[in-house]
Design a protein with these regions (language model features):
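Conserved S/T- and glycine-rich ATP-binding loop of Class I adenylate-forming
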Residues: 9, 20
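Intrinsic disorder at enzyme termini
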Residues: 1-8
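Glycine-rich flavin
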Residues: 21-124
Length: 124
């Protein structure tokens, strides 16, 4: 059994690693952490690359890729200590995709995919 990443997955990993290393040098991460903020310009840049919608179906504005590609991005974001709303958005999107009604998916997943909407998972 072969567990190597595909060429496309390796390209996603390489691109993410390079971009995040450039964007989130340790001084910048500290500055953002001390201010209790995230880098909105970096978030918009990742949105333009389609990262928030990597797992969302193309019919709803996403890239229609899979969980492996999503996890590759999460791993690189974690490695870079990137203070961004990516994880919460992805979690909300995954829950909506798995358990949401068609109406909920159509209402929220395009915004999550574009980065216009920000979500999180809550339990009562």
């Amino acid at each position: 059994m072969n567990f190597d990443f595909s060429d496309d997955q390796q390209a996603i990993k390489r691109t993410a690693k390079e971009l995040l290393a450039e964007r989130f040098k340790m001084e910048r991460v500290r500055e953002l952490a001390e201010a209790g903020k995230y880098d909105d310009a970096a978030w918009r840049e990742l949105c333009e690359l389609g990262w928030p919608g990597i797992f969302v179906g193309e019919d709803l504005g996403g890239q229609g890729l899979g969980t492996v590609e999503l996890i590759i991005l999460m791993e690189e974001l974690g490695y870079a200590l990137a203070p961004l709303p990516f994880l919460s958005n992805a979690a909300a999107g995954l829950v909506l995709d798995a358990a949401g009604s068609d109406e909920q998916k159509e209402r929220w997943l395009p915004g999550i995919a574009s980065g216009e909407a920000r979500g999180t998972v809550g339990m009562l």
